[in-house]
């Protein structure tokens, strides 16, 4: 998914900032894989334009030139046999390879199987998957079953990038490192909790992905569920990952399921209309670029 929105907004800027901070090994290499047929020079030029729009800080020219020396591009159609044959030649079985799947969830299984068929998983390797993992309980189980065939559980990283936001990380500190707040964080002092995620952007050219996945899968069952758990969980035994996870699981198990027959009583859904953000006119959902007849009407 190297040419996708997530890569341009989050992944490459993060790698660039790590490089700028001197936190990447000198011999680390980045293989960007996407479906678009283009030269590595064209990919680098387009990536710089995108990153300059999305990054808050100015891009240092010296760091950029160092960064692109690490960066190669491979055009590959994941559904075609030998899609990753070219990638295999870039890998070193004596070093750890990290595969980051910034793609729609429908491609996760296919990509894992292709990587295996093209012998890209023969050395030590890890895999990172962005949410949502699957589009239903059934497809999520299928993805996890496939992952288990090719990777050890400790080498699988299921990522929710909201957890990396500073405000979200500070929730743990606010709740459990502040004795005054911690002692008042209960039903006798808190009447109710509302979690609002107000976005400044729409789908921005991601119609093909977004209208098929929908807001519930894209935001609620991952980002907002994680926020809910951080707000409602009991103090963990420690701030280690496993202890925090165990307390989150207790919250998820305690939630009251919404019965399909009563969805309309508990859920309000809609599509945003035309409006103005920061003084700029923005289109409504059904006027966005790439709009077809809405699958989520």
PLM region spans:
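Secretory/organelle targeting and membrane-embedding segments
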Residues: 1-128, 133-297
């Amino acid at each position: 998914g190297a040419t996708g929105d997530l890569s341009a907004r989050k992944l490459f800027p993060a790698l660039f900032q790590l490089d700028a901070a001197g936190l990447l090994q000198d011999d680390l290499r980045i293989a960007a894989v996407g479906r678009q047929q283009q030269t590595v020079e064209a990919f680098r030029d387009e990536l710089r334009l995108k990153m300059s729009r999305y990054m808050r800080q100015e891009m240092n020219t010296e760091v950029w030139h160092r960064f692109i020396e690490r960066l190669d591009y491979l055009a590959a159609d994941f559904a075609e046999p030998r899609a990753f044959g070219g990638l295999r030649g870039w890998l070193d079985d004596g070093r750890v390879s990290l595969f980051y799947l910034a793609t729609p969830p429908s491609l996760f299984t296919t990509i894992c199987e292709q990587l295996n068929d093209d012998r890209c998983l023969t050395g030590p390797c890890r895999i990172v998957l962005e949410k949502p993992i699957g589009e239903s309980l059934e497809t999520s189980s299928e993805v996890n079953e496939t992952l288990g065939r090719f990777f050890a559980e400790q080498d699988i990283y299921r990522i929710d990038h909201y957890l990396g936001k500073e405000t979200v990380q500070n929730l743990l500190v606010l709740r459990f490192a502040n004795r005054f707040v911690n002692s008042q964080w209960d039903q006798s002092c808190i009447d109710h909790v509302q979690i609002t995620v107000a976005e400044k952007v729409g789908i921005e050219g991601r119609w093909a992905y977004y209208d098929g996945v929908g807001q519930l899968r894209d935001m609620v069952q991952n980002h907002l569920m994680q926020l809910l758990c951080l707000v409602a969980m009991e103090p963990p035994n420690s701030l280690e990952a496993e202890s925090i996870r165990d307390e989150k699981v207790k919250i998820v198990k305690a939630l009251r399921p919404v019965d399909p027959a009563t969805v309309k009583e508990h859920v309000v859904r809609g599509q945003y209309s035309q409006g103005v953000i920061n003084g700029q006119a923005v289109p409504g959902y059904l006027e966005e670029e790439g709009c077809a007849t809405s699958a989520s009407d």
